[in-house]
């Protein structure tokens, strides 16, 4: 009988601990919601900023073409530049949607924080990859590659290279905005979780996983 009583007491204690943990998490979410209300206008503007940058970079690249006595070249002839246009278009759409999402007050939940965090990460890496690919193309256009006998092309198509360089520079400005947004969303997400107290580590009844050396 005493063993059954102990098991019941342990079960009740476990439920009480879980309830206390849930209450603490709800308090942290409420505090995070109050903080989010104060910074919501700033974050909304910050999320809208990449929209203008993406549209500018996309417009410059879409108009980028040149023809002379040596031939004709357009952005659509190069896969890296086409990827830059597509990535800027997608990021512009996400920037608009996320700005509206942030501007509308709504209760803070862990699931929403996870959603915004993951989307910020995806679009940050998307625009970063597009900028890096286009920058590599520009490097080859300006310097060539002697190992594969590629000659530089910007001496002949200077206007094309200058416009491409402008578009890539604007794209990296977008990258900086998305990195900052990723930091904000990651802070909001992980601040909702309470770290375990250090005094509980190694105490009686607590098992600590140890990895073999």
From Swiss-Prot:
Self-association and partners: Homodimer and heterodimers.
Family recorded in the similarity comment: Belongs to the Casparian strip membrane proteins (CASP) family.
One matching Pfam family: CASP_dom
Record has RNA-binding as a keyword: no
Cytoplasmic side: 1-41, 105-113, 188-213
Extracellular side: 63-83, 135-166
Protein name per UniProt: CASP-like protein 2A1
Alphabetical list of InterPro entries matching this protein: CASP/CASPL, CASP_dom
GO annotations of cellular component type: plasma membrane
Localization in the cell: Cell membrane
Keywords, alphabetical: Cell membrane, Membrane, Transmembrane, Transmembrane helix
Transmembrane segments: 42-62, 84-104, 114-134, 167-187
Positions in coiled-coil regions: none
Topology term for the membrane: Multi-pass membrane protein
